[in-house]
UniProtKB/Swiss-Prot annotation:
One of its GO terms (molecular function) is ribonucleoprotein complex binding. PANTHER family: RIBOSOME BIOGENESIS PROTEIN BOP1 (PTHR17605:SF0), RIBOSOME BIOGENESIS PROTEIN BOP1 BLOCK OF PROLIFERATION 1 PROTEIN (PTHR17605). This is Ribosome biogenesis protein BOP1 homolog. The keyword Nucleus applies. Residues 160-180 have a biased composition (Basic and acidic residues). Residues 1-195, 207-240 are annotated as: Disordered. HAMAP family: BOP1 (MF_03027). It is found in: Nucleus, Nucleolus; Nucleus, Nucleoplasm. It comes from Anopheles gambiae.
Length: 865
């Protein structure tokens, strides 16, 4: 088909009387004068080549490195290819060089008969390659196949003429092999690719168009109305095949796919051929110059004629719409010429020549404003402006203006009004207001003391108002009224309205006061009866508990495992771990005995050192008095108790409720509430001696505490707390909590503040440097408080009671003595159960961590962290 077109072009050139010129290619245009006739063929081919070069951005073909196949003609932008022999010899070059225009005309006349049988539709289109329909939508597959067969026949004829015909059998075999590889989707071997290259180069044809040539625009006869929805109401989003969105596609360079379709399936990358495949496609595919690669799917898309035309119009700076008429006749809707005759000739209305009523009302308002002085005339305005511009004079002293104001009373307060007369002052009062003889006699007796009288007059009754005589006390009452107005001071009292919210102190948020225990972490189970007491080792690794099941248990804190159980033979009411970290010793109050137990936990050398220290009793030169020997006895332990860890037994004459250690770990005190003046006894471990500090009973003693720094002893009775100096043996202070029964107390690590719990649900904070009365009382429990405790390191304190709750509070004590302690309740931990109206018995803090332990009537010990 292409050859036939070229021959037709050459024939037209011969008819136009062009001079014969030698040509070097069969596809080269013959003469410049023939540009108008073949503007839709040859220029379009050069346009195709230039557009292909701009898309590929290549100066020359990558496969044509030596320039053997293609030759550029600088005069015409048309690419021509030379046909090579299979041996690589250039035979046609000499023959084509000698070809004249007469020979071309002769060949065109011989082919006239063949051209008559061609399809008429070929002349209407610029090129069959540039059809709008894609291969999937084209219905004329049979016509395309027939065109391809005609092209192949023409190529074979030309090859025969040039002496390049190949054996048909070898060509059929090569096509069969190519079809086999294409059906298996496998790349072609190099020999088949080279064979296809030879077939392509044998024809020496390449369809091109010029870049400056536009496809023919269909002629329009008038402007027909177009339906904007004729092509279908679609959107850009529906045509998108890859759903990855607007992202850089180089993110998928390392993967086998380039995204996902609407069914969430991977879009596999298209296979990329090598340079040979690219060259074959460039030579064979007539749509190669208009084929672009979709960056989102990797598929090759063939641009239609409309797309090519749109690109060319945009590149040349023209309107993208091909149907838009740039030179459409202008319609001047509004003329610029001045009309000499009136457009409308309506007669004037009556109001156009009558005076306006609105202006009449406005003038009336102006006149009224001038009469009232609100509006100034021009002369008046000039006079006021002249006065304003005159120099102004001021008084030297400001008091000259304020003489009249000084004569007046500043902030005058009105005198109180007199009381209105009552029923007793009436001329005809009711009978009950009249005096009887007894009341009249009493009124007369107070003549010397008139201010004590119930009334300053005697009520009288008259029949009519005419019978009322003159008032004898009128002048005197007027005079007293004047004295009141003159002498009685009057002033205004400013009352400050204070809201209830201002009386409540502003406390910080608990979030700002962390860390403090918030959740239950571990539960220590093993006792069979209620647990009354608990104590923690100074290093914070073990705890000891005492219970009504007559046992003392040693627990490991981190695992909640019971390490050792020591039976005592009686109810254990108090346990205390020795605060001295150099020895491992626990004091337990069980019945009338105090047991000093080596728990045998922790450092082995420390356990052995404790046993060596308690093995032999030191010799004492002093002799205890009779009242001490009758109250307490230091005894040895049996073999069974020794195996359990008991080292020393101290027997008292009454039941021991509490045992507490001194800070150094050598002294400890015991409390026997029924012991009268011997209720409190202090024992020395190093000398194995005991002493009674008091000679008289001051009340029923509940508990005692040693001061953490000073040699002081705090003794709590039912209603008072006494502070004794152990060196001077004097009472230093007596605290008055104002309660009926004290249950427990704890002292701050610094020693300046004391915490007291009562059976009356009240928690009291004492500042020992401030007062002997409570600094603050907290009513945060709903039942009796059993135990209170301070944390050794953190500003925390806790209280436990029979309402199942352990309340952790923030108690900050400042070094500045002028600043009061800050007390903020933080957390209520309510996990224990109520058994026989009892719940939580004891509470104690961990020595180093913000943890708290509690023991209760439900036979458990709970750790809160």
């Amino acid at each position: 088909m292409v050859a036939n077109k070229e021959r037709a072009i050459k024939r037209k050139a011969s008819e136009g009387g062009a001079k014969p010129e030698p040509i070097t290619s069969k596809q080269e245009p013959l003469d410049e004068s023939n540009d108008e006739d073949n503007s839709n063929e040859s220029d379009y081919e050069s346009d195709k080549e230039n557009l292909l070069g701009s898309i590929e951005n290549e100066g020359e073909d990558s496969s044509d490195s030596d320039g053997e196949y293609a030759t550029d003609d600088d005069e015409d932008d048309v690419l021509s290819f030379e046909s090579l022999n299979s041996d690589g010899e250039e035979e046609d070059e000499e023959e084509d060089a000698g070809t004249t225009l007469e020979e071309v005309e002769r060949e065109a006349e011989e082919d006239d008969d063949e051209e008559d049988g061609e399809d008429d539709e070929e002349a209407d289109s610029a090129d069959d390659v540039n059809s709008d329909s894609s291969p999937e939508e084209d219905e004329g597959d049979l016509e395309d196949s027939s065109d391809e067969e005609l092209e192949e026949e023409e190529e074979e004829e030309e090859a025969k003429e040039n002496g390049k015909e190949k054996p048909a059998k070898a060509k059929a075999e090569r096509k069969q092999r190519e079809e086999q590889f294409e059906s298996d989707d496998e790349p072609l071997p190099d020999d088949l690719k080279l064979g296809r290259i030879e077939d392509v180069l044998g024809t020496g044809e390449k369809k091109t168009r010029g870049l400056g040539v536009f496809p023919p625009v269909p002629k329009r006869k008038g402007k027909a109305a177009q339906d904007e929805y004729a092509a279908g109401d679609t959107s850009d989003e529906e045509d998108i095949r890859n759903t990855v969105g607007n992202i850089p596609m180089h993110w998928y360079d390392e993967y086998k796919h380039v995204g996902y379709d609407w069914d969430a399936k991977k879009i596999i990358k298209a296979k990329k051929g090598d340079a040979i495949d690219d060259f074959l496609q460039r030579m064979e595919d007539p749509n190669f110059w208009r084929t672009v690669t979709d960056p989102q799917t990797g598929q090759k898309v063939v641009l239609s004629d409309e797309d090519i035309g749109l690109i060319k119009r945009i590149m040349s700076g023209r309107n993208p719409d091909a149907e838009y008429d740039d030179y459409e006749p202008f319609i001047e809707w509004f003329t610029s010429e001045v009309e000499k005759m009136p457009i409308r000739n309506i007669p004037e209305s009556k109001r156009s020549f009558l005076p306006s009523k609105a202006e009449k009302h406005k003038i009336g308002r102006y006149v009224h404003a001038l009469k009232m002085g609100w509006m100034k005339t021009m002369a008046e305005k000039r006079r006021l402006e002249a006065i304003r511009r005159q120099p102004k004079f001021y008084m030297l002293w400001t008091t000259d203006h304020g003489k009249e104001e000084m004569r007046r009373i500043h902030d005058h307060v009105a005198a109180p009004k007199r009381m209105l007369p009552g029923h007793a002052e009436s001329y005809n009062p009711p009978p009950e207001y009249l005096f009887d003889e007894k009341e009249l006699e009493e009124w007369n007796k107070l003549a010397n003391q008139p201010w004590k009288r119930k009334r300053a007059y005697v009520p009288q009754k008259y029949n009519s108002l005419r019978e009322v005589p003159g008032y004898t006390r009128y002048v005197k009452e007027r005079f007293l009224r004047c004295l009141d107005l003159y002498l009685a001071p009057r002033m205004r009292r400013s009352r400050v309205a204070v809201g209830a919210e201002y009386l409540i102190p502003k406390l910080p948020s608990p979030r700002d006061l962390q860390p403090f225990p918030t959740l239950q972490n571990l539960i220590y189970t093993g006792h069979t009866s209620l647990i009354r007491c608990i104590s923690v080792e100074p290093k914070g690794e073990y705890i000891v508990t005492g219970s009504d099941d007559m046992t003392v248990k040693i627990w490991e804190i981190s695992t909640a495992r019971c390490i050792r159980t020591i039976p005592t033979g009686d109810i254990v009411r108090s346990v205390a771990w020795c605060p001295n970290s150099k020895i491992s010793l626990v004091a337990a109050a069980s019945g009338k005995r105090v047991l000093l137990i080596n728990p045998k936990v922790g450092d082995y050398m420390l356990v052995k050192k404790t046993d060596d220290l308690l093995t032999e009793a030191p010799r004492s030169d002093t002799v205890d008095s009779e009242r001490i020997r009758s109250a307490v006895q230091w005894g040895e332990v049996t073999e069974e108790e020794k195996k359990l860890g008991v080292r020393i037994v101290i027997t008292h004459f009454r039941e021991v409720r509490q045992v507490t250690w001194h800070g150094r770990g050598d002294y400890f005190a015991t409390v026997m509430p029924d012991g009268a003046y011997r209720s409190v006894m202090i024992h020395q471990l190093s000398k194995r001696r005991s002493q009674v500090p008091f000679s008289k009973s001051k009340g029923l003693i509940q508990c005692v505490l040693f001061h953490p720094i000073k040699p002081c002893l705090f003794v709590a009775t039912q209603r008072h707390i006494r502070v004794y100096d152990l060196v001077k043996q004097l009472m230093m202070k007596k605290l008055y909590p104002g309660c009926k029964w004290i249950s427990s107390m704890a002292i701050h690590p610094k020693g300046d503040n004391l915490l007291i719990g009562t059976y009356e649900k009240r928690l009291m904070w004492f500042d020992l440097d401030l007062s002997t009365k409570p600094y603050q009382q907290l009513r945060i429990h709903n039942a009796a408080i059993r135990s209170v405790a301070f944390h050794p390191r953190y500003p925390l304190f806790a209280s436990a009671g029979d309402d199942r709750s352990v309340i952790v509070s923030h108690g900050m004590v400042y070094n500045d003595l002028l600043q009061n302690p800050l007390i903020v309740p933080l957390r209520r931990l309510k996990n224990h159960a109520v058994v026989n109206d009892f719940s939580v018995f004891d509470v104690v803090f961990h020595p180093t961590q913000p943890w708290v332990f509690s023991s209760g009537a439900d036979n458990t010990v709970r750790l809160y962290t």
